[in-house]
Amino acid sequence: MTLNTEAKQKIINKHQTHGTDTGSVEVQVAMLSERINQLSKHLQSNNHDFSSRQGLLKMIGQRKRLLNYVKKQSESRYSSLVTKLGIRG
């Protein structure tokens, strides 16, 4: 479940902090969130795809670690990122 180039560029443009930003934490979390959403939809129709389920859990863990890093650095960046992506209540 990979993202095509246009989808990646759209996510990068939406979440980048400056013009040439492609690897900031915000962009990484946004990319992971999109891949997690796609893989979750896949797993709803393919319940027995255990290797994809394991990959999904790894991506969720990576996103959690990145969000914890952002939260330690700046609470305002964390809260704006979470609300922008619509994750966590």
UniProtKB/Swiss-Prot annotation:
The keyword Oxidoreductase does not apply. Keywords: Ribonucleoprotein, Ribosomal protein, RNA-binding, rRNA-binding. PROSITE patterns: RIBOSOMAL_S15 (PS00362). The keyword Ribonucleoprotein applies. InterPro entries: Ribosomal_uS15, Ribosomal_uS15_bac-type, uS15_NS1_RNA-bd_sf. SMART domains: Ribosomal_S15. Pfam families: Ribosomal_S15 (PF00312). GO terms for biological process: translation. Residues 1-23 are annotated as: Disordered. GO terms for cellular component: cytosolic small ribosomal subunit. GO terms for molecular function: rRNA binding; structural constituent of ribosome. Belongs to the universal ribosomal protein uS15 family. Part of the 30S ribosomal subunit. Forms a bridge to the 50S subunit in the 70S ribosome, contacting the 23S rRNA. HAMAP family: Ribosomal_uS15_B. One of the primary rRNA binding proteins, it binds directly to 16S rRNA where it helps nucleate assembly of the platform of the 30S subunit by binding and bridging several RNA helices of the 16S rRNA. This is Small ribosomal subunit protein uS15. It comes from Prochlorococcus marinus (strain SARG / CCMP1375 / SS120).
